[in-house]
Amino acid sequence: SMGRYSYSRAVKEKNEERFDSYLKVMAFLNENLGADVANEEVKSRSRFYAAVEDKLRFEKLAEKHADILFEEEKDCLERDHEKYMQFLQNLIKDPSGIASQTPEHLAFTIQFAGINESSSLAFSFRDLAANVARLSDNRELLNKAITWALEAITLFGNFTCYETLAEVLYKMGYQKEALWQMEKALDKMPAGNDAIAARIHGKLDKIKNNK
């Protein structure tokens, strides 16, 4: 979309004026969608400052960003469960949808039908924790990032959430614990993706060699 292009360009150029223009457009869209404009701006600023490696401004916003995510998390699992039950009822009413899918695709559809909101929030918590691990040396903030990575795992135990937890732990000097979590990421990683496997193995070697 135009918004994503504008944001990507602002990050690439580290251009605050372009980013402010993007915020104005998003404020208009978010208002029309009934979203909390102020909260959406905090999240956008946090992501932008992390992307352009503005450590100080990112650190100031990280906790506020997390608070917004925790607020958004309320009742999201219930809503996802309701959507999942509705999805199953629709399958029962019209089983022709099953016949047209391969078993693998059907399994994928069923798995993701019940985690729409929670998976999206999980990745938001994960990205926030990953940005803290990458940019910050603030011990208190890193401690909080452990909680955010764990929250991501609770919402949706994707392998990248374990990978992020390992990175936070490693940044804090917990080599053994980081190794355990990176090994979990390796176990949960989808089979057959050589690029992902190489990335995780590279991080495992880094932790083992304490580089």
Which sequence ranges carry the predicted segments?
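Oxidative protein folding and maturation machinery
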Residues: S1-K211
